[in-house]
Amino acid sequence: MALIFEMESLSASYGANIVLEDVNFRVSESDFIGVIGPNGGGKTTLLKIILGLVKPVSGKIVFNPDLNGTGTIGYLPQISTGDISYPVNVTDVVMSGMMIRKRIITRMSAEDRKKAAGIIDELGLSGMESSSLSELSGGQLQRVFLGRAIIGDPKLLLLDEPGNFVDSTFENDFYDKLKELNKRMAILMVSHDIGMISAHVRSYACVNRKLNYHPSSEISNEQLLAYACPIQ
């Protein structure tokens, strides 16, 4: 499998507070990795470094030079109720994911709109194209933002606690959709719900300042303690 990125002896801090220390970690095509660990352990910072939003204080992250930097990464952040207050509809949000790939503000082409319509249909949102976000259920809203994350055909999909805003009726469908997406992109998913994600991920990155990689979807409480990676 082709490498997507590799972290080498990477450390990150906020002022004097070291958040990640001496991290060595690599992600390749077809990986589906659950990122777990205690609150404040560095999970979200790990994602921000991959996204280029936080710079390491030492070490480095190296991306495969054969990958086009723009559109390489899709990102589904934690969703809050504030995200639904904007006067935009489903199509607007999904298509906004293409602006990252285009880099500049430009009018969307007929081809862009056709692609957005295909994503909306793929995610089971047909008929809701003109619906405002405030009209959607939690599961529908999560699908809209997932559509925004994948419309650029990323090689890597980052998910930050995706289960927090998913209603129970859509939960299984959501993870089934991730399984399909994993056929064409690697997935790195931050979650505190090991019970749910263990049926879907292939391995774990246990993050608590240090990062310990566990190459199996099965992980015991004893192993979590050995990794200094209790789950809260």
Q: In which residue ranges do the predicted regions lie?
A:
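Conserved structural motif at the start of ABC-family nucleotide-binding domains
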Residues: 5, 19-20
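Helix-to-loop junction immediately C-terminal to a conserved catalytic motif
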Residues: 51
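Conserved ABC transporter NBD signature motif
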Residues: 59-73
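Conserved ABC ATPase "signature" region
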Residues: 109-128
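Conserved ABC ATPase signature
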Residues: 132-136, 140
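Catalytic Walker B motif of ABC-type/P-loop ATPase nucleotide-binding domains
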Residues: 157-161
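Conserved beta-strand-loop-alpha-helix hinge in the C-terminal portion
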Residues: 207-232
